[in-house]
Amino acid sequence: MNQVEQSVAEYVDEVWEDVVADIEQLVSYPSVAVSADAEPGAPFGRPVRDALDCALGIAQKLGYQTSDDEGYVGIADIPGRGDKQLATICHVDVVPAGPGWNTDPFAMERREGWLLGRGVIDDKGPAVLSLYAGAYLLKHGIVPRYTFRALLGCDEEVGMSDVHHYLENHANPDFLFTPEIGRASCRERV
């Protein structure tokens, strides 16, 4: 293992329980987007707004500069040395829990190395992991070449109007990817 790999492994060991606790906290919000329940600053209803506030609170705790695009998208930045921007995009809204749950879908459980709960995979878990990945830079005093921006959407499951609103009001990132897992399982640590 080289020095960088060792540093990352130590960071993961150090923050892992905080990562899991933050995923658990974010999962606790039943953030099903309902445009009919819109209110100022909460275009997809209060539960989604509350989940967005939770995610932005996690980002602030980790040292990000945060802002809010009128409740459509949360923005968490680690300023870089240049004008370019590398971004991740995740979302804090979920589809309704539906039947088939043997446990409360909004009370995350750890079971035999697995994290179980609505949004753990899609997409609250990846949102938290994305924030902690960027926070590695802050913890180690690394100023990135590009601004690292974590976008936290609120309407991915219904119509993506969050992304359309963002693009109408902000420049496109120079590079964007989603860390959405896309698998039907979420292993705690392998």
Predicted regions and their residues:
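Acidic/histidine-rich catalytic neighborhood of metal-dependent amide-processing enzymes
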Residues: 123-189
